[in-house]
Curated annotation (Swiss-Prot):
A molecular-function term among this protein's GO annotations: actin filament binding
Keyword vocabulary terms for this entry: Acetylation, Actin-binding, Coiled coil, Cytoplasm, Cytoplasmic vesicle, Cytoskeleton, Disease variant, Membrane, Phosphoprotein, Repeat, Ubl conjugation, WD repeat
Disulfide bonds: none
Residue ranges, annotated region (Disordered): 403-432
Stretches assigned to coiled coil: 424-460
Protein's gene: CORO1A
Name assigned to this protein: Coronin-1A
Short name of any one Pfam family annotated for the protein: WD40
Origin species: Homo sapiens (Human)
Family under the similarity heading: Belongs to the WD repeat coronin family.
PTM annotation (N6-acetyllysine): residues: K449
Pathology linked to this chain's protein: Immunodeficiency 8 with lymphoproliferation: A disease of the immune system leading to recurrent infections, and characterized by CD4+ T-cells lymphopenia. Patients can develop B-cell lymphoproliferation associated with Epstein-Barr virus infection.
Residue ranges, compositional bias (Basic and acidic residues): 403-418
Modified residues (Phosphothreonine): T412
Record CDD domains: bZIP
Length: 461
């Protein structure tokens, strides 16, 4: 009698652990807008989530450790004039976040260490060029100040945030219909897109050329998502002709047939994929679902291996995914999600059970650090580079907020890009006002530090 051989994997027993109530963010008003983005973005310093706002669009930014009940009057980032659809933290500066909105603009914001004391209405730069709502913002993985945006005008724009100027535009001739998803390759040389015309495309954005494309990776009519995974492969999620949800793995050089195609269930929510290149695990989270499925990708058939599923009682309205440098390596945490409920944000830690408290080198290979590998000019000139890697053996401490190198460039770019209008203040007046605002922010931060020290003294007594 033959025995079934169980595949060996150190990730077979990964389990999800939701945070205790006092480690959640309570009483937050998550946006009711219908849009298939995660509505949440996190990094080692902050958690940001798109919230309900009257008279415009807003999102909430909280220091990661500021858990518990969130005051209903907590200051928000509220410069958009219509609902915010997508947010993304800069991978090279934990204090910088980009937002795309129904008001057709992309805005880039700087968040002070310690979080917001007052509502933030003025972005560092506003990027204008789309003619319809902007539903996707995505930072370049390794080049400094390079930001991509995709709008419902079927246009992708790549911006140099340091100048406020559009470097590249991929028009409707590339995508004739709504763009569902965009993902950068690990070295930032290619982008992978999915579109309402039922095609997945791999594009060299600097040349504007489609390197490869697949028509109907999934037969259903619902939206498809596509992301780069391990070397030379992409992963897609979509629906069958019978409306069953599917996940598929493809070789980018041979897109005729998938390496693996698995049917999951008959739920209607679009599956959002999150890929970890350090472990080759992909996590699938669906809006309206109450579960997170995870799979391991290997270089040998059958290539895509189901590991397990984390389930809870309440469905999710959105999901944020922590970069590897924000995890607790001493607890063997290999991923952390921030699940949005209707009035709450709940961290969920994905952990590999290990008996030893020592650093587990096999779980934590060198990972992408916060420093860019290229400048925007180098990338535009044709250079590609993988991320600069760091070790997590001694843990990761986020650096203190430093004056952004993009600030001066952003201000100049904003003045250069904006049309001259009668009655607008001079550049000298603008500079003086900005300097005063910086001084006021510094004063507020100093007063907050004094207040914190005073509270510590009172508690000690």
């Amino acid at each position: 009698m033959s025995r079934q051989v169980v595949r060996s994997s150190k990730f077979r027993h990964v389990f999800g652990q939701p945070a205790k109530a006092d480690q959640c963010y309570e009483d937050v008003r998550v946006s009711q807008t219908t849009w298939d983005s995660g509505f949440c973005a996190v990094n080692p310093k902050f958690v940001a989530l798109i919230c309900e706002a009257s008279g415009g669009g807003a999102f909430l930014v909280l220091p990661l450790g500021k858990t518990g009940r969130v005051d209903k009057n907590a200051p928000t980032v509220c410069g958009h004039t219509a609902p915010v659809l997508d947010i993304a933290w800069c991978p090279h500066n934990d204090n910088v976040i980009a937002s795309g909105s129904e008001d057709c603009t992309v805005m880039v914001w700087e968040i002070p260490d310690g979080g917001l004391m007052l509502p933030l209405r003025e972005p560092v730069v506003t990027l204008e060029g789309h003619t319809k709502r902007v539903g996707i913002v995505a930072w370049h993985t390794t080049a400094q100040n390079v930001l991509l945006s995709a709008g419902c005008d079927n246009v992708i724009m790549v911006w140099d945030v340091g100048t406020g100027a559009a470097m590249l535009t991929l028009g409707p001739e590339v995508h004739p219909d709504t763009i569902y998803s965009v993902d950068w390759s690990r070295d930032g040389g290619l982008i992978c897109t999915s579109c309402r015309d039922k095609r997945v495309r791999i594009i060299e954005p600097r040349k504007g050329t489609v390197v490869a494309e697949k028509d109907r990776p999934h037969e259903g009519t619902r939206p498809v998502r596509a992301v780069f995974v391990s070397e030379g492969k992409i992963l897609t999620t979509g629906f069958s002709r019978m409306s069953e949800r599917q996940v598929a793995l493809w070789d980018t050089k041979h897109l005729e047939e998938p390496l693996s195609l698995q049917e999951l269930d008959t739920s209607s929510g679009v599956l959002l994929p999150f890929f970890d290149p350090d472990t080759n695990i992909v996590y699938l989270c669906g809006k309206g679902d109450s579960s997170i499925r995870y799979f391991e990708i290997t270089s040998e058939a059958p290539f895509l291996h189901y590991l397990s599923m984390f389930s809870s009682k309440e469905s999710q309205r959105g999901m944020g995914y922590m970069p590897k440098r924000g995890l607790e390596v001493n607890k063997c945490e290999i991923a952390r999600f921030y699940k949005l409920h209707e009035r709450r944000c709940e961290p969920i830690a994905m952990t590999v059970p290990r008996k030893s408290d020592l650093f587990q080198e096999d779980l934590y290979p060198p990972t992408a650090g916060p420093d860019p590998a290229l400048t925007a000019e180098e990338w535009l000139g044709g250079r590609d580079a993988g991320p600069l890697l760091i070790s997590l053996k001694d843990g990761y401490v986020p650096p203190k907020s430093r004056e952004l190198r993009v600030n001066r460039g952003l201000d100049t770019g904003r003045r250069r890009a904006a049309p001259e209008a009668s009655g607008t203040p001079s550049s000298d007046a603008v500079s003086r006002l900005e300097e005063e605002m910086r001084k006021l922010q510094a004063t507020v931060q100093e007063l907050q530090k004094r207040l914190d020290r005073l509270e510590e003294t009172v508690q000690a007594k």
